[in-house]
Amino acid sequence: MSSRSRSKTRESRALGIALTPKAARYMEKRPYAPGEHGRTKRKADSDYAVRLREKQRLRAQYGILEKQLRIAFEEARRTQGLTGENLVEILEMRLDALVLRAGFARTISQARQFVVHRHILVDGKLVDRPSFRVKPGQTIGVKARSEGTEPFQVAAAGGHVDVLPKTPAYLSVELDKLQARLERRPKRAEVPVTCEVQLVVEYYAAR
Protein backbone atom coordinates (compact mmCIF):
# COMPACT_ATOMS: atom_id res chain seq x y z
CA MET A 1 0.00 0.00 0.00
CA SER A 2 1.45 3.40 -0.98
CA SER A 3 1.93 6.16 1.59
CA ARG A 4 -0.96 8.07 0.01
CA SER A 5 -3.22 5.03 0.28
CA ARG A 6 -2.18 4.50 3.90
CA SER A 7 -2.95 8.15 4.64
CA LYS A 8 -6.42 7.95 3.08
CA THR A 9 -7.12 4.67 4.87
CA ARG A 10 -6.10 6.11 8.22
CA GLU A 11 -8.20 9.23 7.61
CA SER A 12 -11.14 7.03 6.63
CA ARG A 13 -10.89 5.02 9.84
CA ALA A 14 -10.63 8.18 11.95
CA LEU A 15 -13.74 9.68 10.31
CA GLY A 16 -15.67 6.41 10.18
CA ILE A 17 -16.30 6.60 6.42
CA ALA A 18 -14.50 5.05 3.45
CA LEU A 19 -12.93 7.76 1.29
CA THR A 20 -11.58 5.31 -1.31
CA PRO A 21 -12.48 1.78 -2.47
CA LYS A 22 -9.22 0.52 -0.94
CA ALA A 23 -10.12 2.11 2.39
CA ALA A 24 -13.55 0.46 2.23
CA ARG A 25 -11.97 -2.98 1.91
CA TYR A 26 -9.57 -2.26 4.76
CA MET A 27 -12.35 -1.02 7.05
CA GLU A 28 -14.33 -4.21 6.52
CA LYS A 29 -11.47 -6.01 8.25
CA ARG A 30 -10.78 -3.35 10.88
CA PRO A 31 -14.00 -1.44 11.61
CA TYR A 32 -12.54 0.77 14.33
CA ALA A 33 -10.49 3.94 14.57
CA PRO A 34 -6.69 3.92 14.24
CA GLY A 35 -5.00 3.27 17.57
CA GLU A 36 -7.93 1.19 18.80
CA HIS A 37 -7.92 -2.59 18.84
CA GLY A 38 -11.59 -3.40 18.44
CA ARG A 39 -12.39 -4.27 22.04
CA THR A 40 -11.93 -1.10 24.06
CA LYS A 41 -14.85 1.31 24.12
CA ARG A 42 -14.18 4.74 22.72
CA LYS A 43 -14.64 7.60 25.19
CA ALA A 44 -17.75 9.66 24.47
CA ASP A 45 -16.93 12.69 22.35
CA SER A 46 -17.84 16.23 23.35
CA ASP A 47 -20.47 18.10 21.35
CA TYR A 48 -17.69 20.13 19.77
CA ALA A 49 -15.76 17.01 18.76
CA VAL A 50 -18.88 15.50 17.18
CA ARG A 51 -19.53 18.65 15.14
CA LEU A 52 -15.88 18.94 14.17
CA ARG A 53 -15.74 15.34 12.97
CA GLU A 54 -18.90 15.83 10.90
CA LYS A 55 -17.39 18.91 9.28
CA GLN A 56 -14.20 16.99 8.57
CA ARG A 57 -16.24 14.16 7.06
CA LEU A 58 -17.91 16.50 4.61
CA ARG A 59 -14.65 18.22 3.71
CA ALA A 60 -12.84 14.90 3.17
CA GLN A 61 -15.54 13.48 0.90
CA TYR A 62 -15.14 16.44 -1.45
CA GLY A 63 -11.38 16.62 -0.92
CA ILE A 64 -11.44 20.38 -0.37
CA LEU A 65 -9.58 22.81 1.86
CA GLU A 66 -11.08 24.35 4.98
CA LYS A 67 -11.15 27.76 3.27
CA GLN A 68 -13.14 26.33 0.36
CA LEU A 69 -15.67 24.72 2.68
CA ARG A 70 -16.05 27.93 4.66
CA ILE A 71 -16.70 29.94 1.48
CA ALA A 72 -19.31 27.40 0.38
CA PHE A 73 -20.94 27.58 3.82
CA GLU A 74 -21.19 31.38 3.68
CA GLU A 75 -22.85 31.13 0.27
CA ALA A 76 -25.21 28.45 1.57
CA ARG A 77 -26.18 30.65 4.50
CA ARG A 78 -27.06 33.52 2.16
CA THR A 79 -29.13 31.27 -0.10
CA GLN A 80 -32.84 30.80 0.52
CA GLY A 81 -33.66 27.46 2.14
CA LEU A 82 -31.96 25.23 4.70
CA THR A 83 -28.29 26.10 5.06
CA GLY A 84 -27.08 22.52 5.48
CA GLU A 85 -28.92 21.25 2.43
CA ASN A 86 -27.78 24.25 0.40
CA LEU A 87 -24.18 23.54 1.41
CA VAL A 88 -24.17 19.97 0.11
CA GLU A 89 -25.97 20.99 -3.07
CA ILE A 90 -23.40 23.72 -3.77
CA LEU A 91 -20.49 21.33 -3.22
CA GLU A 92 -22.11 18.69 -5.40
CA MET A 93 -22.13 21.01 -8.40
CA ARG A 94 -18.33 21.25 -8.36
CA LEU A 95 -16.86 19.87 -11.57
CA ASP A 96 -14.62 17.34 -9.83
CA ALA A 97 -17.56 15.99 -7.82
CA LEU A 98 -19.63 15.46 -10.96
CA VAL A 99 -16.73 13.81 -12.80
CA LEU A 100 -16.69 11.29 -9.94
CA ARG A 101 -20.47 10.83 -9.85
CA ALA A 102 -20.49 10.24 -13.62
CA GLY A 103 -18.10 7.31 -13.16
CA PHE A 104 -15.25 8.91 -15.12
CA ALA A 105 -12.98 8.57 -12.06
CA ARG A 106 -12.60 6.10 -9.21
CA THR A 107 -11.99 8.62 -6.40
CA ILE A 108 -12.42 12.34 -5.83
CA SER A 109 -8.63 12.72 -5.95
CA GLN A 110 -8.48 11.10 -9.39
CA ALA A 111 -11.39 13.25 -10.57
CA ARG A 112 -9.53 16.37 -9.48
CA GLN A 113 -6.38 15.23 -11.28
CA PHE A 114 -8.32 14.69 -14.49
CA VAL A 115 -9.65 18.25 -14.32
CA VAL A 116 -6.33 19.87 -13.38
CA HIS A 117 -4.48 17.96 -16.12
CA ARG A 118 -6.92 19.35 -18.69
CA HIS A 119 -8.72 16.19 -19.72
CA ILE A 120 -12.26 17.43 -18.95
CA LEU A 121 -14.61 19.53 -21.08
CA VAL A 122 -17.70 21.49 -20.08
CA ASP A 123 -19.96 22.28 -23.03
CA GLY A 124 -17.06 21.33 -25.29
CA LYS A 125 -14.55 23.71 -23.68
CA LEU A 126 -11.57 22.76 -21.52
CA VAL A 127 -11.98 23.55 -17.84
CA ASP A 128 -9.06 22.97 -15.49
CA ARG A 129 -10.58 24.24 -12.21
CA PRO A 130 -11.96 21.46 -9.98
CA SER A 131 -14.10 24.05 -8.17
CA PHE A 132 -15.82 25.15 -11.41
CA ARG A 133 -19.58 25.35 -10.75
CA VAL A 134 -21.48 23.30 -13.32
CA LYS A 135 -24.90 24.71 -14.16
CA PRO A 136 -28.02 22.66 -14.90
CA GLY A 137 -28.12 21.89 -18.62
CA GLN A 138 -24.36 21.87 -19.06
CA THR A 139 -22.57 18.80 -20.39
CA ILE A 140 -19.37 17.21 -19.11
CA GLY A 141 -17.11 15.21 -21.38
CA VAL A 142 -13.56 14.04 -21.96
CA LYS A 143 -11.16 15.61 -24.45
CA ALA A 144 -10.90 13.54 -27.64
CA ARG A 145 -7.14 13.03 -27.26
CA SER A 146 -7.68 11.70 -23.74
CA GLU A 147 -10.49 9.26 -24.49
CA GLY A 148 -8.10 6.57 -25.72
CA THR A 149 -5.88 6.65 -22.63
CA GLU A 150 -6.08 3.75 -20.20
CA PRO A 151 -7.82 5.54 -17.29
CA PHE A 152 -10.67 6.69 -19.49
CA GLN A 153 -10.91 3.39 -21.36
CA VAL A 154 -11.36 1.70 -17.97
CA ALA A 155 -14.04 4.23 -17.03
CA ALA A 156 -15.89 3.89 -20.36
CA ALA A 157 -15.98 0.11 -19.89
CA GLY A 158 -17.68 0.57 -16.52
CA GLY A 159 -14.56 -0.23 -14.54
CA HIS A 160 -15.63 1.88 -11.55
CA VAL A 161 -19.32 0.94 -11.43
CA ASP A 162 -18.86 -1.65 -8.68
CA VAL A 163 -17.12 0.74 -6.29
CA LEU A 164 -19.18 3.90 -6.83
CA PRO A 165 -22.74 4.71 -5.71
CA LYS A 166 -25.51 4.48 -8.29
CA THR A 167 -25.60 7.49 -10.63
CA PRO A 168 -27.90 10.07 -8.98
CA ALA A 169 -31.06 11.22 -10.75
CA TYR A 170 -29.82 14.77 -11.31
CA LEU A 171 -27.09 13.49 -13.62
CA SER A 172 -27.63 11.70 -16.95
CA VAL A 173 -24.64 9.67 -18.12
CA GLU A 174 -23.59 7.87 -21.30
CA LEU A 175 -20.58 6.14 -19.82
CA ASP A 176 -19.46 4.41 -23.01
CA LYS A 177 -19.28 7.84 -24.66
CA LEU A 178 -17.77 9.50 -21.56
CA GLN A 179 -20.55 12.07 -21.62
CA ALA A 180 -22.69 13.40 -18.77
CA ARG A 181 -25.23 16.18 -18.31
CA LEU A 182 -26.34 17.93 -15.13
CA GLU A 183 -30.10 17.85 -15.55
CA ARG A 184 -30.99 20.00 -12.54
CA ARG A 185 -29.75 21.23 -9.20
CA PRO A 186 -29.05 18.28 -6.88
CA LYS A 187 -31.22 17.73 -3.81
CA ARG A 188 -29.52 16.85 -0.55
CA ALA A 189 -31.43 13.57 -0.17
CA GLU A 190 -30.05 12.36 -3.52
CA VAL A 191 -26.40 13.25 -2.92
CA PRO A 192 -24.35 10.17 -1.93
CA VAL A 193 -22.32 11.71 0.89
CA THR A 194 -22.34 10.58 4.52
CA CYS A 195 -22.85 13.64 6.69
CA GLU A 196 -25.20 15.10 9.30
CA VAL A 197 -25.21 18.52 7.69
CA GLN A 198 -27.00 20.21 10.59
CA LEU A 199 -23.98 19.46 12.77
CA VAL A 200 -21.77 21.17 10.19
CA VAL A 201 -24.04 24.21 10.33
CA GLU A 202 -23.84 24.20 14.13
CA TYR A 203 -20.06 23.95 13.98
CA TYR A 204 -19.71 27.09 11.86
CA ALA A 205 -22.50 28.95 13.66
CA ALA A 206 -20.60 28.60 16.93
CA ARG A 207 -17.39 30.09 15.52
Curated annotation (Swiss-Prot):
- What would be an example GO MF term here? rRNA binding
User: Mind telling me which Gene3D superfamilies this protein's record contains?
Assistant: Ribosomal Protein S4 Delta 41, Chain A, domain 1 (1.10.1050.10), RNA-binding S4 domain (3.10.290.10)
Q: What is this protein called?
A: Small ribosomal subunit protein uS4
Enumerate the spans annotated as S4 RNA-binding domain: 93-158
A GO BP entry:
translation
Q: Does the keyword Glycosyltransferase apply?
A: no
Assigned protein family: Belongs to the universal ribosomal protein uS4 family.
Which parts of the sequence are annotated with region: Disordered?
20-45
Q: Which SUPFAM superfamilies match?
A: Alpha-L RNA-binding motif (SSF55174)
Give the protein's function: One of the primary rRNA binding proteins, it binds directly to 16S rRNA where it nucleates assembly of the body of the 30S subunit.
Q: Keywords in UniProt for this one? A: Ribonucleoprotein, Ribosomal protein, RNA-binding, rRNA-binding
Mind telling me which GO cellular component terms the entry cites? small ribosomal subunit
> How would you summarize the oligomeric state and partners of this protein?
Part of the 30S ribosomal subunit. Contacts protein S5. The interaction surface between S4 and S5 is involved in control of translational fidelity.
Instruction: Extract the Pfam families matched here.
Output: Ribosomal_S4, S4
Q: Does the keyword RNA-binding apply?
A: yes
Source species = Leifsonia xyli subsp. xyli (strain CTCB07)
